[in-house]
Amino acid sequence: MAKKIAGYVKLQVPAGDAKPAPPIGPALGQRGLNIMEFCKAFNAKTAQMEKGTPIPVVITAYADRSFTFEMKLPPVSYFLKKASGIQSGAKTTGRGFIGKVTKAQVREIAEKKLPDLNCQSVDAAATMIEGSARSMGLQVVE
């Protein structure tokens, strides 16, 4: 028989830098999960990744206080910032551009993120990522 699911916890944790401090500690403590066990397992899985990369994690908490977790790829904004070389997005969207990304870079990001997005084709994913780029204040050029 399958374990009874008690709930889900969604977090964004820096790769290789999971600590029992907030936001991880309180989120897992509420569900009665072993915080250090998660931190060690997460840090071990993300050891080969670039340290500090934000990794979205979905933790499935079970009624017997055990858990499993699934890691996703970093957010689109992380890839766009890296591709354009900016530190943060525009303060006000639609009032000029603070950087540029090429359609080739957008397509490359779309190919990476396709499993995490709710679309079937790379073209649809590229369109979504272009919209994210524009809302961050990035100009999409040929």
UniProtKB/Swiss-Prot annotation:
Modification after translation, per record: One or more lysine residues are methylated.
Keyword Cytoplasm: no
Alphabetized InterPro entries for the sequence: Ribosomal_uL11, Ribosomal_uL11_bac-typ, Ribosomal_uL11_C, Ribosomal_uL11_C_sf, Ribosomal_uL11_N, Ribosomal_uL11_N_sf
One MF term in the entry's GO annotations: structural constituent of ribosome
Keywords for this protein: Methylation, Ribonucleoprotein, Ribosomal protein, RNA-binding, rRNA-binding
A Pfam match: Ribosomal_L11
Superkingdom of the organism of origin: Bacteria
GO BP term, example: translation
One Gene Ontology cellular component: cytosolic large ribosomal subunit
Description of how the protein assembles with itself and partners: Part of the ribosomal stalk of the 50S ribosomal subunit. Interacts with L10 and the large rRNA to form the base of the stalk. L10 forms an elongated spine to which L12 dimers bind in a sequential fashion forming a multimeric L10(L12)X complex.
NCBIfam families: L11_bact
Summary of the function given for this chain in its UniProt record: Forms part of the ribosomal stalk which helps the ribosome interact with GTP-bound translation factors.
Family: Belongs to the universal ribosomal protein uL11 family.
Protein name as catalogued: Large ribosomal subunit protein uL11
